[in-house]
Each structure stands twice: as C-alpha cells, then as structure tokens.
Amino acid sequence: TPQDIISDFSYICLLLTIKFEYMENISRRTAIKTFLAGGVALATTGIEAAAAAKKKTDVKEPLKGNVRHSVSKWCFGDYKLDEFCEICKHIGIESVELLDPVDWPIVQKHGLTVAMAQGAGLGIDRGFNDPALHDELVASYEKVIPMVADAGLTNLICFSGRRNGVTDLQGWENCEKGLKRLIPLAEKHKVVLTMELLNSVGHKDYLCDHTVWGAELCRRIGSPNFKLLYD
C-alpha cells in the first residue's frame, strides 16, 4: 500500500541518515532533504545523493537538546559496545539502555548514561505475578538496586511475567505483594523500579499488557519509586 511504501521509505531514510552522518560527517537535515528529493530513485542512487550533499555543505548543525534519546544495544547486531557508544554520542543519543552492570561503566566512559538498567530478575516470562518466584526475585533485586544507585543511575526494569490463567485482580495482588517487599530499599537508594508494559500479541500471555492494568498496579504500590515503561 502507499502507507507501507512511505513507512519503508522513511525507515530507509533513517538508516541511511545515521550511516552517512557517522561515516561522512554530513548533517542529518541535509541528508534527509537529499534523500527525500531523490524520491523513488533512492533505491538506486542513495549513495550518489549523499555524496552530492556532502559536496554542497559540511556544516554541522548542533542538536537543540529538546528531546533526550535512548537506544537499546540489542537491536543493532554485532557492534562492539565501545564502537556503538561512539556512534550514539556522535549523533546526539544520550543513553544506551537495557544493559547489565558489567556494561554500565563502558557507556559512562563515553559520557552517556543508561536510561533503563537491567541485571535483576528472571526475565520477561517469570515475574512478580508468580508468588513462588518472589523470594528469588526479591533476592536478585536486593543485590542490584544498590548497584544501580552506586553507578549514579535511576531506573531498573522489572516484569509482571506471564498471566498463567490468573484474573486481573489476582495478578494485581500477586505483583503488589512481591514488589512492596522491595519498595523501601528502592526508596532508600532513590532507584525507580519500572515495570514494562508489553503487548501480549508479541509476548504471548504477558500480564501487564495495557495501561489500565499497569496504572492500577501503580496506584496499589503507591510509591514514586515504582513506575511504568512503555514498549
């Protein structure tokens, strides 16, 4: 459909903008204008168009800083983290997120931060909805929460886990019971436990899969140190 073509074209523009800005040091705005002007010909003449833009101007337009961007490393294949951080810093991204404690110093070495830390818990499918996992989850988060604070970070991801046949009400009660064991420690260290809302179409049977459910859990927890992360 025309919408699909536009979407695919925009995605190609984004990838090529990042690629050529880093490799050729041309401005993103110049690159985008050049690609859009090329229209359908981008598919065969994108490299030539970028080269032409390079000849026209080498002016680097500074970012205004109105939007703070963060990116997940796992989306970008086999880049070494050091190299990936260099690219992110070059194009104005401030954070590389969803990294374990061993990687936090590497990101910070490049003057970046970790907007959403990971390293505690048992993964997406095994979360606070299962009371049988609470002791293990609490022990894991009790270890990592102080590490987050010591690293100067704020947010630590957590998950509801799968629904496993329980009602919304039972899920709220299960998660509330487990998470409230951690809230005093999170408040002490000024760390925010952040539960990710995930679409249960892509993550089958995930419990915290819509805003109403997540917002009610926040109300039940009743602490500024528990919030939601939108996927």
Predicted regions and their residues:
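N-terminal secretory signal peptides
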Residues: 1-26
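C-terminal segment of N-terminal export signals and the immediately downstream linker at the start
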Residues: 18-21, 47-79, 86-87
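N-terminal export signals
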Residues: 24, 30-52
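Residue-level signal for the nucleotide or nucleotide-sugar donor/cofactor binding architecture
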Residues: 26, 136, 209
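Alpha-helical elements of Rossmann-like donor-binding domains used by nucleotide-donor carbohydrate transfer enzymes
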Residues: 30, 34, 83, 143, ...
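Short linear capping/connector segments at secondary-structure termini
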Residues: 31, 160-164, 196-200
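Structural motif corresponding to the early beta-alpha repeats
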Residues: 70, 75, 94-183, 187-192
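Acidic/histidine-rich catalytic cores of soluble enzymes
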Residues: 85-89, 181-231
